[in-house]
Amino acid sequence: MNLPIVNERNRPDVPRKGVQKIRTVIEGFDEITHGGLPIGRTTLVSGTSGTGKTLLAVQFLYQGIHHFDYPGLFITFEESPSDIIENAYSFGWDLQQLIDDGKLFILDASPDPEGQEVVGTFDLSALIERIQYAVRKYKAKLVSIDSVTAVFQQYDAASVVRREIFRLVARLKQLQVTSIMTTERVEEYGPIARFGVEEFVSDNVVVLRNVLEGERRRRTVEILKLRGTTHMKGEYPFTITHDGINIFPLGAMRLTQRSSNARISSGVQTLDEMCGGGFFKDSIILATGATGTGKTLLVSKFLQEGCRQRERAILFAYEESRAQLSRNASSWGIDFEEMEHKGLLKLLCTYPESAGLEDHLQMIKSEISEFKPSRIAIDSLSALARGVTNNAFRQFVIGVTGYAKQEEITGFFTNTTDQFMGAHSITESHISTITDTILMLQYVEIRGEMSRALNVFKMRGSWHDKGIREYSISHDGPDIRDSFRNYERIISGSPTRISVDEKSELSRIVRGVKDKTAE
């Protein structure tokens, strides 16, 4: 049960092994820290109110006790032990049982509610001795301190704060414990800590943020430094679930998933022919177009075909209710309720604004892990993009597509464009590069009548039809016809009819080229 002792590296007769780490078993945290926290060192966790500092400190101890049987010590300067124990219950962590078993000890250093007056020179000697006594008595390997700001907020001299924090960190290192020390900051992107000195006396610094982006809050974590070892750079989104902190280390994702040559049907025979025999299994398809062009219809046919093949499927809907989806599908001869009754289909409908993108991503991953579908659909991505930054939205899409490919799932997503007719950007967030197949749907005005057009704009690794097909929607679903004949500039929104003379001239030129080639 003894951890590797880092201070042995300082002995001349012991070969250097580098900084060794202990896994935190916090979802995603070990990935961005390249293996966990350095053993025998103190990590400063800084953040504004509500970022999850206390939760991280408690979860660090709980996971260490639960997975590795390392005794832990929690030192609280703010909340009472009873509040900490009660709050932990909401995550399924029975701290009282760990205390009764002698695996966890909570040292109550919270302030006297009646107030206290400081007289003379301030130092932490008595507190440091209490911590040392508790560490040795309970043989603690892990220590969490929450938070040092509460101790020093009534003292103005930065030199005193620096001196006492340095003494505390030095004693923890001498005791050979791996510790987390939380501190508050005033701004999300300002000074790292309240007093401006905490980060300089700590070996490692982790910054938690809770930033208002657009109309939603977004939590991120950044590893500012891990002294003597490597870590991932930048901010990574995280959410707080019933299991605690869950980080999405998108930068740690590797493009190592297998690619299948097997084809699956879209549920529309003509569309399969346009795609060279159907979609690739485990590929990501994006149908983009104005409202009413038939995107949800293509999604419904895609899901229906999967259920017909006895495959499981999930539809994540962010614009329509379950009743509305079922009603619309029935008008095309698709019975969603029967598929659900057979256990082949799952409809999940929610408003995009009901949660942050990280929460939606976590929910999608959890549902996929539980239901184990072969096909998933999201209708629509553009609904989720409302009120968030392009970068946050792109990270969300990368998280979904990366997880789907990892699980070898075929994904069909829709995107609603803001222009009703004419040329338009496929997506505003450049997510088109992440998808494997793009179906472009749009309206076309021909001789005063409105028609629909469909084009396989892109399909990685496969031949596909380059033509712009006309299609209509009937009670059987989409009816894809031949390409628009005698018309050009359809995608631009200004279709122009090619005259007979122009056609004859083009034919003559083509025949001339063929004759010269034959000679």
Curated annotation (Swiss-Prot):
The modification Phosphoserine is found at residue 432. Keywords: ATP-binding, Biological rhythms, Hydrolase, Kinase, Magnesium, Metal-binding, Nucleotide-binding, Phosphoprotein, Repeat, Serine/threonine-protein kinase, Transcription, Transcription regulation, Transferase. GO terms for molecular function: ATP binding; ATP hydrolysis activity; DNA binding; kinase activity; magnesium ion binding; protein serine kinase activity; protein serine/threonine kinase activity; protein serine/threonine/tyrosine kinase activity. ATP 1 binds at residues 50-55, 90, 225-227, 229, 231, 241. The modification Phosphothreonine is found at residue 433. GO terms for biological process: circadian rhythm; protein autophosphorylation; regulation of circadian rhythm; regulation of DNA-templated transcription. SUPFAM superfamilies: P-loop containing nucleoside triphosphate hydrolases. Binds 2 Mg(2+) ions per subunit, one in each domain. Mg(2+) is required for hexamerization and phosphatase activity. Its cofactor is Mg(2+). Mg(2+) 1 binds at residue 54. ATP 2 binds at residues 291-297, 332, 452, 458-460, 462, 464, 466. Mg(2+) 2 binds at residues 296, 319. The interaction with KaiA enhances its phosphorylation status, while the interaction with KaiB decreases it. Residues 1-248, 262-519 form the KaiC domain. In the homohexamer the 2 domains (called CI and CII) self-associate to each form a 'donut' layer; the compactness and local conformation of the domains varies over the cell cycle and impacts function. CII has the autokinase and autophosphatase activities, both CI and CII have (weak) ATPase activity; CI has the clock pacemaker role. Belongs to the KaiC family. PANTHER family: CIRCADIAN CLOCK OSCILLATOR PROTEIN KAIC 1, PTHR42926. Homohexamer; hexamerization is dependent on ATP-binding. Core component of the KaiABC complex, at least composed of a KaiC homohexamer, a KaiB dimer and two KaiA dimers. Interacts directly with SasA. Multimerizes, probably forming homohexamers, no interaction with KaiC2 or KaiC3 is seen. Interacts with KaiA. In another study interacts with itself, KaiB1, KaiB3 and KaiC3. Interacts with SasA (hik8). Component of the oscillator and circadian clock in this organism, enhances fitness in a rhythmic environment. Autophosphorylates in the presence of KaiA, no activity is seen in its absence. Central component of the KaiABC oscillator complex, which constitutes the main circadian regulator in cyanobacteria. Complex composition changes during the circadian cycle to control KaiC phosphorylation. KaiA stimulates KaiC autophosphorylation, while KaiB sequesters KaiA, leading to KaiC autodephosphorylation. Clock output pathways impact the RpaA transcriptional regulator. KaiC enhances the autophosphorylation activity of SasA, which then transfers its phosphate group to RpaA to activate it. KaiB and KaiC together enhance the phospho-RpaA dephosphatase activity of CikA. This is Circadian clock oscillator protein KaiC 1. It comes from Synechocystis sp. (strain ATCC 27184 / PCC 6803 / Kazusa). The gene is kaiC1.
